[in-house]
């Protein structure tokens, strides 16, 4: 059976090898990003790597500080490179993100970066079933029931995310997450615009035209894909199939 944790680690370690001293690095959130933080922390300790990290969640910031990474909460310069995971990736390089509830900060950091690298295991690139992972939408608490009903006009199977104890999940920004269960998504640009046009919606976990490279870990190493000018992901040497 595939070792998905090993795959995540392989993707994270390969992407981390692109980080150089002096860079400001956007640090993602989630299980794969944890391996990134571990590797960056190792390089800080063993290789004297000097970087500043901009974290996309309080949890990632906590892990990064513990790993010895210097944190910059509001950098004056543009972020050189953001490395983050994804819940799903299609063949156009569009991402579904927000499974960990940090989609707003993740999008802000990625948007303000020179480049964004995505680290995933071998399950995550799935064009045919893109949208089978629920699409997270961050909404403000004020009149959230009305916002939820407006989202249900687009996708009837939409519910507010809850914690294991039944309480509503609250983001680091004090907002709620609505998960939209489409099953399949095709017109990602139009869908993003439609959802964001609803008052009460802060942002949506569709990342269009943001990713530059995809690092897909496998049991033996890592495949690297670039998002071409044609809007397709391609192997750095040869077409993705």
UniProtKB/Swiss-Prot annotation:
GO biological process terms held by the UniProt record: D-ribose metabolic process; pentose-phosphate shunt, non-oxidative branch
Keyword presence, Coiled coil: no
Active site: 106 (proton acceptor)
NCBIfam families: PRK00702.1, rpiA
PANTHER family documented for this protein: RIBOSE-5-PHOSPHATE ISOMERASE
Subunit (UniProt): Homodimer.
Entry protein name: Ribose-5-phosphate isomerase A
Organism encoding this protein: Thermoplasma volcanium (strain ATCC 51530 / DSM 4299 / JCM 9571 / NBRC 15438 / GSS1)
Source organism phylogeny: Archaea, Methanobacteriati, Thermoplasmatota, Thermoplasmata, Thermoplasmatales
């Amino acid at each position: 059976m595939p070792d998905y944790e090993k795959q995540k680690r392989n993707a994270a370690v390969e992407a981390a090898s692109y980080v150089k001293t002096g860079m400001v690095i956007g640090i993602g959130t989630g299980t794969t990003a944890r391996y990134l933080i571990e590797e960056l922390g190792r390089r800080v300790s063993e290789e004297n790597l000097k970087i500043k990290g901009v974290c996309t969640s309080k949890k990632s910031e906590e892990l990064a500080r513990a790993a010895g990474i210097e944190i910059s909460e509001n950098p004056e310069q543009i972020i050189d490179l953001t490395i983050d995971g994804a819940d799903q990736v299609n063949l156009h390089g569009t991402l579904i993100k927000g499974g960990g509830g940090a989609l707003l900060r993740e999008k802000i950091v990625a948007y303000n970066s020179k480049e964004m690298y995505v680290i995933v295991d071998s399950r995550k690139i799935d064009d045919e079933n893109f949208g089978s992972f629920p699409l997270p939408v961050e909404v403000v608490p004020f009149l959230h029931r009305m916002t939820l009903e407006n989202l249900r006009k687009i996708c009837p199977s939409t519910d507010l995310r809850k914690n294991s104890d039944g309480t509503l999940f609250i983001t680091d920004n004090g907002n709620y997450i609505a998960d939209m269960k489409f099953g399949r998504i095709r017109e990602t640009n139009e869908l993003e615009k439609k959802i964001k046009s609803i008052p009460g919606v802060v942002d949506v976990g569709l990342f269009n035209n943001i990713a530059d490279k995809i690092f897909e870990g496998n049991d033996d190493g890592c495949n690297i894909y670039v998002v071409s000018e044609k809007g397709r992901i391609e192997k750095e040497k040869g077409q993705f199939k």
